């Protein structure tokens, strides 16, 4: 029996994780659930899964949740705040942590889980983008297990040699030529370039293949999401930027590929449903039912691939630039993107202003060495303040 903490349980990844948990009550028990402010949804989850602890973002939200839980006769302990997130992520009663809090807010509890030696199901890509070396050092020092949840990185993990994370060898020594990171292209893959400045919020969050939250849906539309995944792949698999190739694949059936020096290319295919990588990571090295139907290749009939157009998707180039610059550059880029995307969702800037704002912030704040978590948070704060001042 694994005891699991789900950071961000009311988001799309959290809901999918609980769906898998519900299918296997003999394998998994929920230790803690967390949400920022979706109190009613969290209370309903507590009623179904009976966690030991529930964490929300504020004292006000905690009071509301406590009233709801008392009305249901539940004994779940209610906590709030950032420190409580780190506590439930590192608690001795917890074996496994689903890190699914969106954005920089997920960094501290993910690091806490790593330092406590937990099995981490990493859906929060910003943790690696902001502090890749720090997180990987914490994992190595504690013996934590890091399992990627992003469909692309989970696919790469499945296509890697079984001994890849057990042997201290370079990708080349494992015979790996490069990683092929697939991308759907989002809702604007074929839209006229001169109309992108007219994109509405509703259009940007309407992803053609995946059901996701608003922020990540916009990131997919700009392909910043894929840029973040390039940086994540670099840290997860130790592959340099020039060996990570992004390929547009509109059908979203091939989730990523690994190319080997003997000419072989291994790919992982499946329906676009996050329960597949979640179930894989939760049960690894076993396999369990995820509730996802297998793909029907005859029905799909055709799989297509193309190179990304960097004029259409300048955020992808910004991410490669940040990875090459190293240091605090990825954290600066990530923070600027979060501010820009929220400004777009709030109707304060246009769609094409997102990449322009990020580029301005990156130019204004040159990269500096990242030595500890406080440095990361300071660079994150500076980038957010700078981005806000440019709006």
Curated annotation (Swiss-Prot):
Positions of Mn(2+) binding: 150, 152, 229
Pfam families: DXP_redisom_C, DXP_reductoisom, DXPR_C
Pathway, per record: Isoprenoid biosynthesis; isopentenyl diphosphate biosynthesis via DXP pathway; isopentenyl diphosphate from 1-deoxy-D-xylulose 5-phosphate: step 1/6
Binding site residues for 1-deoxy-D-xylulose 5-phosphate: 125, 151-152, 184, 207, 220, 225-226, 229
Keywords: Isoprene biosynthesis, Manganese, Metal-binding, NADP, Oxidoreductase
GO BP field: isopentenyl diphosphate biosynthetic process, methylerythritol 4-phosphate pathway involved in terpenoid biosynthetic process
GO MF term set: 1-deoxy-D-xylulose-5-phosphate reductoisomerase activity; manganese ion binding; NADPH binding
Cofactor: Mg(2+); Mn(2+)
Family, similarity comment: Belongs to the DXR family.
Function: Catalyzes the NADPH-dependent rearrangement and reduction of 1-deoxy-D-xylulose-5-phosphate (DXP) to 2-C-methyl-D-erythritol 4-phosphate (MEP).
HAMAP family registered for this protein in UniProt: DXP_reductoisom
Name of this protein: 1-deoxy-D-xylulose 5-phosphate reductoisomerase
Species, as recorded: Herminiimonas arsenicoxydans
């Amino acid at each position: 029996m694994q005891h699991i903490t789900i950071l961000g349980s009311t988001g799309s990844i959290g809901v999918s994780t609980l769906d898998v948990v519900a299918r296997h009550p003999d394998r998994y028990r929920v230790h803690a659930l967390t949400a920022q402010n979706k109190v009613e949804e969290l209370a309903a989850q507590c009623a179904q899964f009976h966690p030991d602890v529930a964490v929300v973002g504020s004292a006000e939200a905690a009071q509301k949740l406590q009233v709801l839980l008392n009305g249901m006769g539940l004994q779940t302990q209610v906590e709030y705040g950032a420190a409580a997130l780190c506590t439930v992520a590192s608690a001795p009663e917890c074996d496994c942590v689903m890190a699914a809090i969106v954005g920089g807010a997920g960094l501290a509890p993910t690091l806490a889980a790593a330092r406590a030696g937990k099995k981490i199901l990493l859906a929060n890509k910003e943790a690696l983008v902001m502090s890749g070396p720090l997180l990987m050092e914490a994992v190595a020092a504690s013996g934590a297990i890091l399992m990627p949840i992003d469909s692309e990185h989970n696919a790469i993990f499945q296509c890697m040699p079984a001994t890849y994370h057990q042997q201290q060898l370079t990708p080349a020594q494992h015979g790996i030529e490069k990683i092929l990171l697939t991308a759907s292209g989002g809702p604007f893959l074929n839209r006229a370039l001169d109309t992108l400045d007219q994109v509405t919020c509703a259009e940007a969050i309407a992803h053609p293949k995946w059901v996701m939250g608003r922020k990540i849906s916009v990131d997919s539309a700009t392909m910043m999401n894929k840029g973040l995944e390039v940086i994540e792949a670099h840290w997860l698999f130790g592959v340099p930027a020039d060996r990570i190739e992004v390929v547009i694949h509109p059908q979203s059936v091939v989730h990523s590929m690994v190319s080997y020096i003997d000419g072989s290319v291994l790919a992982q295919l499946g329906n676009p449903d996050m329960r597949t990588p979640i179930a894989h990571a939760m049960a690894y090295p076993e396999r369990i039912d995820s509730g996802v139907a297998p793909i029907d290749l005859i029905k799909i009939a055709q799989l297509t691939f193309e190179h990304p157009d960097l004029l259409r998707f300048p955020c992808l180039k910004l991410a490669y630039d940040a990875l090459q610059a190293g240091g605090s550059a990825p954290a600066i880029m990530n923070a600027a993107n979060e501010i820009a995307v929220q400004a777009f969702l709030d109707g304060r800037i246009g769609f094409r202003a997102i990449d322009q704002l990020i580029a301005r912030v990156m130019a204004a704040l040159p990269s500096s060495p990242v030595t500890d978590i406080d440095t990361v948070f300071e660079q994150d704060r500076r980038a957010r303040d700078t981005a806000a001042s440019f709006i």
